[in-house]
Curated annotation (Swiss-Prot):
Family as reported in the entry's similarity comment: Belongs to the paxB family.
Protein's name according to its UniProt entry: Terpene cyclase adrI
Principal place of residence: membrane
GO biological process assignments: terpenoid biosynthetic process
One annotated GO molecular function: lyase activity
Role of this protein: Terpene cyclase; part of the gene cluster that mediates the biosynthesis of andrastins, meroterpenoid compounds that exhibit inhibitory activity against ras farnesyltransferase, suggesting that they could be promising leads for antitumor agents. The first step of the pathway is the synthesis of 3,5-dimethylorsellinic acid (DMOA) by the polyketide synthase adrD via condensation of one acetyl-CoA starter unit with 3 malonyl-CoA units and 2 methylations. DMAO is then converted to farnesyl-DMAO by the prenyltransferase adrG.
Record keyword Kinase present: no
Cellular compartment(s): Membrane
Glycosylation sites: 164
Transmembrane helix found in the keyword field: yes
Membrane association type: Multi-pass membrane protein
Organismal lineage: Eukaryota, Fungi, Dikarya, Ascomycota, Pezizomycotina
Spans through the membrane: 20-40, 53-73, 76-96, 112-132, 141-161, 171-191, 209-229
Amino acid sequence: MEESSLLSAILDHRDALASVAEFLRILAGICWTLNYFSMLRTSRKDKIPSTGIFPLCNDIGWEFIYAFIYPTASAHWEGGVRVWFLVHCIVIIFIIKYAHNEWDHFPLIQRNLYFLYGVVTIGFAIGQYSFAREVGPDLGFFYGGVLCQTLASLGPIAQILSRNSTRGASLLTWLLRAIATFGGFIKLTIYYLTGNAAGPWFESPMCKFYIGLTLVLDFTYPICYYVIQRQELANAQKEKKEKSK
């Protein structure tokens, strides 16, 4: 009975829910784009990469496949994936420009950054293409995007913890990504409830795991940021006191 009432309420407000989903789709697209420009700003300000090699290269590989090889699978984004691909091409140039500042301890990597980023990007693109051939472009777009999202959420945590510094980190970049992510989750939930799901959602154990993992990771990042920032401030005050003696 309750299920029937819920379904009836959803059908009664189908048009309103569709408008909300469309707004969230546009909001997510804008926030993802601004997120990439925030990466550029942070990299330029701190002179080190603001994102890891795997998240960035996987994003570019996924975008290339679904912008140019299987564009119909990303048609609902109305060209947004192509825009992200072009923006990411600019981002990777900036990232590589400053990446050498992180590899003084490993000259072999430092001398071959363009080659390294190129090989990893091509590798991810081949992987995304192979997966699309295996499961079909529509499902490939969905689960390939899941990998992009997971790396985008996990990468910054690994980066800030390994550096033990907030240099190259940004709460603005995190906030834009979080808004895009949570807005996207709500949008996909509306699609699912109204029977317009572009891929599996609540009926999929893998999707439930993905939703839970992403939420945990995105709530973890600002905690890590503030803990390390407090540590930096404490160290700065300690150094200031020692110098004043």
